Amino acid sequence: MAGLGLRLKAAKWTLRSGSGAVSREWSSEMGKGVRRFSTETENDVPTSGISRPLAEILKELNKKVPDSVIRTRVEDGCSIKYIPWHIVNRIMNMHAPEWSGEVRSVTYSPDGNTVTVAYRVTLYGTDAEIFRESTGTTSVDDKGYGDAVQKAEAMAFRRACARFGLGLHLYHEDAL
């Protein structure tokens, strides 16, 4: 269950600074974003937000992560590089502070040997929202840390973030 999505915000916000304010409205009309600008001079209150345009957020997430945060594990005799979920979480908080994540489904295989978690990560920029989904599957008999659902969720979360470019270079390093 992998998916891609882009949705324009159907919201209105006002940025006030200096002598005037700029009001910006977003709506979707048949998938096309419409901007409306107006100038206001009443109620001038300086405000600032933490949001940025999606292009800026994605540019930051696509940067190579430092080697110091990369971990390695051996799986089926192969060495695999990865970024722990809690580090991915901190990177998301730093570069996309208004992101959200949600478990979309938890599915056990018919034989009960594996569990798959589908996870969605949504980024909220000043201009739009965008989401990516991915899945993680693990054996219920895996004796490592945590339970199988936690492992599958962490895997799905990391993969969904990689769909935004975060740590994506790890998947291609060996091929270069």
Swiss-Prot record:
Effect of loss of the gene: Reduced fertility, increased sensitivity to mitomycin C, and decreased levels of intrachromosomal recombination.
Domain of life: Eukaryota
InterPro entries: RAD52-like (IPR037489), Rad52_Rad59_Rad22_sf (IPR042525)
One Gene Ontology MF term: cobalt ion binding
GO cellular component: mitochondrion; nucleus
Family: Belongs to the RAD52 family.
Protein name, UniProt field: DNA repair RAD52-like protein 1, mitochondrial
Source organism of the structure: Arabidopsis thaliana (Mouse-ear cress)
Underlying gene: RAD52-1
